[in-house]
Amino acid sequence: MYDRKEGRIFMADKMFENNQVSIVGEIVSDFRFSHEVYGEGFYMVDVAVNRLSNYMDYIPLMISERLIDVNEDMVGQNIYVTGQFRSFNRHEEKKNRLVLSVFVRELEFLDEIDDEVKSNQIFLDGYECKEPIYRKTPLGREIADLLIAVNRSYGKSDYIPCICWGRNARFASGFDVGGHVQIWGRIQSRE
């Protein structure tokens, strides 16, 4: 459950405590078929989420046809979702591409988006799986690139790239491969 006013995520299912996402935004694309598992179809749809800077992040959602009518035009609808941030490797010609999306577990349609609500939150509890890369941007901002492995059921893991800024970047640059980390933040669009 999510307390939107307070911006806190509460999930009763213990299995999902190590990977929690809540997003509030506007649907900006049609549903695209992704795959089917045991007769259940899964579809991709994009949601625009506003940052405090008024820049929009476009976040892909993976959603079951059992949660929403994928044949209906939902573009322009405001939606609140909770779920997990998932990854998989898509094999493209001669290389693999890491595909990231929010796997939707629950959703709610909203009449309007309250600007006071924290509209984009993620919590990950996992393990650093490669050496952090610390660097400075051309504008002098400190950042550290991390790759976090987050375990899920059936022996699977999601590999989530993360960026830390400022003093958090300096702190994260000292993380050891295999070390346990907990991260709170937001999901940003990939360029």
Short names for language-model regions:
Residues Y2-E191:
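OB-fold and OB-like single-stranded nucleic-acid-recognition modules
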